[in-house]
Amino acid sequence: MSAVSGWWDDFFWGSLVVVELFFVALIMTILFGLIGAGAKLSNNRVAKSIASGYTIVFRGTPEILVLLLFYFGSAITLTTIAQIFDPEIKFVDFPPFWAGSFAIALIIGSYATETFRGAFLGVDPGQIEAARALGISSLKTFIYVRIPAMWRLALPPFGNHMLSLVKDTALVAIIGLEETLFVAEQAIGYTGKPFTMYIVVGAIYLGFSTIITFTVMGLERYANRHLEVTR
């Protein structure tokens, strides 16, 4: 492991980038998933069609292709807009961090849409009827009754989505974001030790995955605590 000794700082900062990317993409994933699930469960045909198209496209397209299309497509769009105001501008780069965050969130959000939709359908209708009988508005019922009940059902599969999300952060290395895999590629160029560097990256991601797994297990126990008490 002597080949890695001069790269620990770089791997540390690369790991922090992975953490930042994970949490930003996670927030957007939840938003995309909730919006998509709400649209698929609505009575609006247009909203249903858009949500269905979203899940079909992003679940059926290779993840690396989505990332590249989003990154370069955004850069081309920004460049076109900028050239309207200043024809001398040749190219406007889109920040790799935000391109990666949006692309990963769109991909995982398409899976989360179906997870949340199924969880919403699994909520006991009696809880909704009880809220209505108490005169609670539809919005408050959705926020305080349906979402908490839905989360209990959605947590196990959503934990898998979180694992997929953290692993997908490795893809952003191809658009120049300096995360752990990018650092490994740089280190390999200097040391000529690809196996060693990839083992380090694998260990880092395994550590992240382990933390996520135990976190989700803890959240599941918390969400089901009232069920354990009644047994």
Predicted regions and their residues:
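Transmembrane alpha-helices and adjacent helix-loop boundaries
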Residues: M1-R231
